[in-house]
UniProtKB/Swiss-Prot annotation:
One of its GO terms (cellular component) is cytosol. This is L-ribulose-5-phosphate 4-epimerase UlaF. Its EC number is 5.1.3.4. It comes from the Bacteria. Induction: Induced by L-ascorbate. Repressed by UlaR. InterPro entries: Aldolase_class_II_sugar_metab, Aldolase_II/adducin_N, Aldolase_II/adducin_N_sf, UlaF. The keyword S-adenosyl-L-methionine does not apply. The gene is ulaF. It comes from Escherichia fergusonii (strain ATCC 35469 / DSM 13698 / CCUG 18766 / IAM 14443 / JCM 21226 / LMG 7866 / NBRC 102419 / NCTC 12128 / CDC 0568-73). It catalyses: L-ribulose 5-phosphate = D-xylulose 5-phosphate.
Length: 228
């Protein structure tokens, strides 16, 4: 697991580097599906003092199998998403400013331009709010459940992120680094949408044919963006 712990450590260290976290407000995980184990950031440990060996390994029930610290308080959310969506290899949660602002407003991040469409096939959805019972019960598990309720059976890698109402963004990808990449993009397009709607409050969504072109040329069966 050392290689995966190193990857998760590096991905977590990317969060402050890209300006996605303040203090300890974020976490990254990755899964080894063959072993049924997840590596995740320890809870409340400052980034500047964190080391690769501080990463915590848990099984799919959340039991710690390796590590001296408690895992992230959001571990149950990560595990619920891994259980539901086999294509996920890494998950990120942050409180990045602009994506969190959309979450607090209770609004999806609208697809307004090609930057958004290069990564997200449509709006980045916002979940419903959790009930008092859901919050007082298994809060983190229920956060995962409300994300799944919102995504349904859609391919999560076509919409690699979501904002949880009154909470903040979660993003995911093929692995931990891909998940962080998508979290960075989500924050940028959230900022762009806020600025664009401020300039033109009547601004419409990106034309569907343009969105389809930009998403499919990067992610479709005949994708041609980048190098083989």
């Amino acid at each position: 697991m050392q290689k995966l712990k190193q990857q998760v450590f590096e991905a977590n260290m990317d969060l402050p580097r890209y300006g996605l976290v303040t203090f300890t407000w974020g976490n990254v995980s990755a899964i080894d599906r063959e072993r049924g184990l997840v590596v995740i950031k320890p809870s409340g440990i400052a980034y500047e003092s964190m080391k690769a060996n501080d990463m915590v390994v848990v099984d799919m029930s959340g039991k710690v199998v390796e590590g001296e610290y408690r895992p992230s308080s959001d571990t149950a959310t990560h595990l619920e998403l891994y259980r539901r969506y086999p294509s996920l290899g890494g998950i990120v949660h942050t409180h990045s400013t602009h994506a969190t602002a959309w979450a607090q407003a209770g609004l999806a991040i609208p697809a307004l331009g090609t930057t958004h469409a290069d990564y997200f096939f449509g709006d980045i959805p916002c979940t419903r709010g959790l009930s008092e019972e859901e919050v007082q019960g298994e809060y983190e598990l229920n956060t995962g459940k409300v994300i799944i309720e919102t995504l349904g059976d859609a391919e999560p890698l076509h919409t690699p992120g979501i904002v949880v109402y009154q909470h903040g963004p979660f993003a995911w990808g093929k692995d931990a680094h891909d998940a962080v990449h998508n979290a960075v993009v989500m924050e940028e397009v959230a900022k762009m949408a806020w600025i664009a709607r401020g300039i033109n409050p009547q601004l419409n969504h990106i034309d569907s044919y343009l969105m389809n072109k930009h998403f499919m040329r990067k992610h479709g069966p005949n994708a041609y963006y980048g190098q083989k």
